[in-house]
């Protein structure tokens, strides 16, 4: 089990760090009182491997509970619960700027000067910082750069290589464009098998429709161009820290052309080793509604 304790200065990026760990599959808990760490770790270890990655945020917001941190870390060590500490730091100047922009009050300076609260927190956390396994100074980092750093430290090789999840979704424009789509492609320019009586009953999951739709020159050219575009976009999305990409392909009813193209794109992405899923949102909508309204 990998047990990460995330701590550090207020405003240094702990929230972004815990979100990044959550994206890596860690079971995350924010602001857990240190007095509960032992019981929490024990409960996780008793899941027989169902929970194998844990991340806890423990910071100065815990008030007097924070003073019990070292005693509880000692208890974890005595019980052979292996843990590592990630400490988020930033310069006073950057922390002041971030607090001014967010218009939040510092937990140790609710009624006093911000810089005094930062200095007090830095002194109180000095010993924790000394014990940290990893220290990340976020002073000159963007959120994406911090996420990248977290992924490199706490993600495994497979996660780093295949961190982008691609969802290929077919849909019918008559039923609305998917609200979560990142890329939308309209394939209504392709010949429509709906108007071929002997094909109308089938869907893009059937060979009859696939042979018809994929048999046209325009279809082959479109798939090749879309494949080439995704080949360019995917590594750039990964570079920017994107973890999910929804590629939506639409035709009129979402049963024939869009399903066929979505299947073809899904197969190509799968062959290239991408982490990809597919969904045909509206494939049965026309049938459920008793036929298509023109």
UniProtKB/Swiss-Prot annotation:
Q: Does the keyword ATP-binding apply?
A: yes
> Which residues of the sequence carry a binding annotation for ATP?
8-15
InterPro entries to which the protein is assigned, alphabetical: P-loop_NTPase, RapZ-like, RapZ-like_N, RapZ_C
Nucleotide-binding found in the keyword field:
yes
Which residues are noted in the entry as GTP-binding? Answer: 59-62
Function description: Displays ATPase and GTPase activities.
Cysteines engaged in disulfide bonds, as pairs = none
| Keywords, in A-Z order | ATP-binding, GTP-binding, Nucleotide-binding
Q: What name is this protein filed under?
A: Nucleotide-binding protein NT01CX_1284
Q: Which family does it belong to?
A: Belongs to the RapZ-like family.
**NCBIfam families linked to this entry:** PRK05416.1
Q: Name one GO molecular function term.
A: ATP binding
